[in-house]
Each structure stands twice: as C-alpha cells, then as structure tokens.
C-alpha cells in the first residue's frame, strides 16, 4: 500500500510504503489451522504480525495460541485491504491497536440471534518483550451480536499492564450494511490506574457508499 502525503502546515510532502503484507494460512488437519503474517514494510520496518495455531475442538468453539491481534474493537481488526480510508482511524491506529502473545477461546452460541464471544489472556507487553515474566493478569474480551442481516453490534473490554500503569478500556461499536451503504460508529473509553494520565475518549463514525 503505497501513498503520497502532503502536510499543509509544514509545506512538505513524502512518499511512503505503509504496508506490504504477506500472509500464509492453512489447515494441518480439518480441526487444526495456522496463520503466519509478516509486514515487509510497515513505514520502512519489517514486522512479524501474526504467528498462531487454532484448534476447532467442536462446532462453534475455537482455541487459539500464539501471536495475534487481541479481541478488541471493530476497526482495529481490519486488514489494510479492508480499510475504507487511506489511513486507519485513531481507534485502530493509536488507542485500540494491540497485538500480543497469548491464548484465546471463542464460541458462537447456538441461538436465533448469532452471538460470538471471544476472550483471552495475554502477556500485556506487546510483540517484542516475550521473554519477560508477568505477575499481573492481562485480558481482553469481545462479544459480537448479529441481530439481523447487515446489522452488527460489538462490545469489548480490555485490561493490560505493560509496565507500572494499568490501562482499562471499554469499546462499543455497531455497523449496518444495506445495498451499497455501510454505516458505522464506534466509541472507545480508556482510563489509567491511579489517575496516571487523563482519560481517553475516541470516536470513529463514517458512511460509505460503493459506486456501481
């Protein structure tokens, strides 16, 4: 994903390769899947993004272990080719952008209204500090409700402590798709332990229309 940006306040521009991702997915067995994804140029840096194995023990149940994006928010889970704009929203890029190493369990409830719940435990220190030992619990959970065709409601909660300050985040988002329209809104609230920093409020809303 190459782009050119011009900063009006500076009167300067730049070319940039924002992403050049390569992904490999497959199944070792019908009930065992894997994924490995690397970004060959994340603003000029090579980054290993995903490296995990996923089990499907029974219908509707998934168990995942490895390096992955944690279950949190709507927009942060979109790959670059799924983004609606050249740049990601602040929720996806700065406030809710978390990849980590850990273990998750997901389950799709056998109900009339499709409900998928996923939660997991993680190191809480990101992708590069995997050798550190942790005493604190770092978790993230997400629930998705598909009330009707095209209507999605997502609720998320996350609690991590990468260093001395614990961060607690809550997110609610929804989108509706009808015809060529995609209407979406998302709100994220983040607070820090012991009032270490001011609370964070982030909002992402947009309407997209696909041209014929």
Question: What are the residue ranges of the model-derived segments?
Answer:
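Detector for outer-membrane/organellar transmembrane beta-barrel domains
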Residues: 134, 144-212
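Outer membrane beta-barrel
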Residues: 1-124, 135-139, 144-152, 206-209
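Outer-membrane beta-barrel and related beta-rich outer-membrane complex signature
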Residues: 48, 75-79, 129-131, 167, ...
């Amino acid at each position: 994903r190459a782009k050119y940006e011009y900063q009006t306040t500076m009167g300067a521009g730049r070319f940039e390769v924002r992403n050049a991702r390569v992904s490999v997915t497959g199944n070792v067995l019908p009930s065992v899947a894997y994924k490995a994804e690397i970004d060959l140029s994340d603003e000029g840096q090579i980054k290993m993004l995903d490296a995990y194995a996923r089990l499907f023990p029974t219908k509707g149940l998934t168990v995942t272990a490895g390096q992955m994006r944690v279950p949190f928010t709507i927009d942060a889970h979109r790959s670059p080719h799924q983004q609606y704009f050249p740049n990601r929203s602040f929720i996806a890029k700065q406030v809710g952008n978390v990849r980590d190493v850990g273990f998750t369990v997901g389950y799709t409830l056998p109900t009339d209204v499709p409900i998928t719940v996923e939660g997991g435990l993680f190191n809480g220190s990101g992708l590069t500090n995997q050798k550190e030992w942790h005493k604190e619990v770092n978790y993230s959970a997400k629930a998705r409700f598909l009330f009707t065709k095209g209507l999605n409601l997502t609720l998320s909660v996350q609690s991590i402590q990468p260093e001395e300050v614990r961060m607690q985040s809550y997110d609610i988002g929804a989108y509706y798709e009808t015809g060529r329209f995609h209407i979406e809104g998302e709100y994220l609230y983040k607070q820090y332990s012991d009032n270490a920093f001011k609370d964070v409020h982030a909002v992402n809303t947009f309407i997209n229309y696909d041209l014929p």
